[in-house]
Regions:
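Structural marker of alpha-solenoid helical repeat scaffolds
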Residues: 65, 99, 133-134, 167, ...
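TPR alpha-solenoid repeat register
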Residues: 38, 72, 106, 140, ...
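Register position in tetratricopeptide repeats
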Residues: 48, 82-83, 116, 150, ...
């Protein structure tokens, strides 16, 4: 739901709402109703019971009696959506709107399909049409705000989330959305404000994703000790939660307590043994605690899976630490050509040249990085020291 972990490990899924619209409430429950109404009511009852095949059969019978029946077309769209066949569902909803423009159920379903197909601009367009008929629907306002967030439209997204809070103070979906929105734009303090409101509402049974999201805010703000508390709380709920394990390991890494991070990297690798990012992080941890043999083995394990620049960097740093400067320089020079904007490579290469008393080459390497127009304090400080 909340973030893409470093180097694109994986992303949590957003909370999706179930549809608040239910056509079954519109059908009369009196005796003597006509055949279409009876079929429609039975179809939607089957749909609610998740008997999708039987529901579809009822809706198709309706189309035999009335080929453009709005309830049948929407019902078939809903059935397809339940099967996660969004394209098929969208076709049914669109067909309904051809003959019944402004049909709320078709508009809602179509917009939801577009959202699930990541066609957010189209989803927004349809939801805006829906709001012309129902301009106080909190769920739709929240979904439109979510869609604006997905296309990185901060102002419109925030405006609609806040509109929901005007209608319903402390609406959890709006608060969660505002947390995501500010987090996406690196406004971590603001994101923290909204997610903590959710925590205050239900501190005992809060969703684990809120705990990891709050932890991630503190992690991003480099308040690692505060992040540890929330990641530990998350792991109390689920000891194998990826985001709790990753966050806790990364916080200990940030606090320079690599010896504590290792067991959490290992816990992730038990579930995902071929995760190169985690392998390189664990290799770094062993390197920092001085277990160079173990670190080298783990970096190589990552490279056996596939090329990984961080594993190569780790091996080069090991060479430098062990005084194998020529080997480190060769490796870092090749790596620099493949990843020209990674400042760490330039710093490590310059440090190798400093150790081999080649000050001019160290300066040349650092100046080469600055030619890309990227400001980096560490590069500037080392360069200034060398030039003075």
């Amino acid at each position: 739901m909340f973030e893409t972990v470093e180097h694109g490990v994986r992303e949590q899924n957003d909370v999706f709402f179930s549809s608040p619209l239910d056509p079954i409430h519109e059908f009369p429950h009196t005796e003597g109703v006509d055949e279409l109404t009876k079929l429609s009511r039975e179809g939607y009852l089957f749909l609610k019971a998740n008997e999708i095949d039987r529901a579809e059969a009822e809706f198709k019978k309706m189309l035999e009696l009335d080929e453009n029946n709005n309830y049948a077309l929407v019902g078939l769209g809903d059935a397809a959506r339940k099967r996660n066949k969004c394209k098929e569902a969208a076709d049914y909803y669109s067909e309904c709107l051809r003959y019944h423009p402004g049909n709320n159920y078709a508009l809602f379903g179509l917009a939801d399909c577009y959202k699930n197909m990541n066609l957010y601009a189209k989803a927004i367009e349809i939801w805006e049409q829906y709001l012309e008929h129902d301009n106080a629907n909190i769920t739709v306002f929240t979904r439109v705000a979510d869609a604006y967030r997905k296309i990185h439209d901060f102002q419109n997204s925030k405006r609609l989330y806040l509109k929901v809070l005007e209608i319903e103070q402390d609406n959890p979906y709006a608060l969660i959305g505002l947390g995501h929105l500010h987090y996406d734009f690196k406004k971590y303090r603001e994101a923290l404000f909204y997610w903590q409101k959710i925590l205050e509402q239900n501190s005992e049974n809060v969703d684990i994703r809120i705990l990891t999201s709050i932890g991630n805010c503190y992690r991003k703000m480099k308040q690692f000790d505060r992040g540890v508390y929330y990641f530990e709380k998350a792991l109390e709920k689920d000891p194998n939660n990826f985001y709790g394990l990753f966050g806790l390991a990364d916080c200990y890494r940030g606090m320079k307590q690599q010896q504590h991070s290792i067991k959490y990297w290992e816990a992730i690798l038990k579930k995902d043994p071929n995760n190169k990012v985690i392998l390189t992080r664990m290799g770094d941890a062993y390197r920092h605690i001085g277990d160079y043999e173990k670190a080298e083995k783990i970096y190589q394990q990552a490279l056996d899976i596939d090329y990984d620049s961080y594993a190569i960097l780790g091996l080069a740093i090991l060479c430098k630490i062990q005084g194998k400067y020529d080997e480190a320089i060769t490796s870092l020079t090749h790596l620099m050509q493949a990843d020209r904007r990674n400042y760490r490579i330039y710093l490590e290469l310059a440090d190798c040249y400093i150790h081999t008393n080649e000050k001019a080459k160290a300066i040349e390497v650092l100046q080469a990085f600055q030619q890309y127009g990227i400001k980096n304090q560490a590069i500037s400080e080392v360069l200034s020291t060398l030039q003075n």
